[in-house]
Amino acid sequence: MLDVAGATASLPALPSPVAGTSRFIRYAFMPNHLHYCGGDDNRQIFNYALAAVREPPLEAMLRKFTGAMPYLNLIARGNGIRDPFDERVVEAYWIGNELLERVEVGDLYGSLRDRFAKQLSPRLMELVAAKAPAGARPHHGFHVFDVWRNVARLDGDVLATLDNCRISWGQVVTIDGGQLAVERPPLVLRGGKLALDPARPERVLRQIDGQGFADFAQPGDWVSLHWGWVCEVLSERQRANLERYTRLHVAIANQTI
């Protein structure tokens, strides 16, 4: 068992360098740290991810992320995968991969109606659910740009939240202790529509108390970012997928902005 309060006991070997639960935490950690989602287990899940350990107590903690879990379950079922925290499923939701293409449109549509029919007006419910046949996928970008954004008018505060909440990508320029200087394309409002501007310099956090998930990032590397936090170093395949699914869901959101 992992002593999530501090030191660790003997740790079981993992079947892969980055287990699905560990990757999930890399992305969920900062919004949870900011009290936007999940339970009150921030330091515990952080320690679990640092140790790369998966145990039943951790899974119970992660299931408190009620915004993400239905998408993970949907992706897993659509691909015949039993474990919603399978590494491929987790990557599909946060970054994007081919698993998203195997989820049936009707399943996403039905899931959205089941989840949000009591929270949204009939007009907004149909607007959101109709994005499934319009090409939306069960990706975090869709959740941010279309499900979360149920406002009639975008302003600066909402735009900043969308930009922080989406998973973005940046290229490392320099390293400064627990921070990185990166070049990142920001989300902007242009002509009343969402768009991505050319990359701009930005400072992001990669460590808390000297610990993080991208300790070996080097200048030139691509990293993923969530609420100003460096989630992990990306391969070129992952970066390309993240950009592809981000641009897809920006375009789909713009259909009703």
Indicate residue ranges for each PLM-predicted region:
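Short, basic/aromatic beta-hairpin or loop at an interaction surface
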Residues: 187-207
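Structural detector for short beta-strands of small beta-barrel domains
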Residues: 160-183
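Short, well-ordered loop/turn sites that connect or cap secondary structure elements
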Residues: 216-217
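Short, Lys/Arg- and Gly-enriched loop/turn segments at beta-strand edges
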Residues: 228-241
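Short peripheral tails and domain-boundary helices/loops at the edges of structured domains
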Residues: 238-257
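N-terminal intrinsically disordered, low-complexity, charge/repeat-rich segments that act as generic
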Residues: 2-157
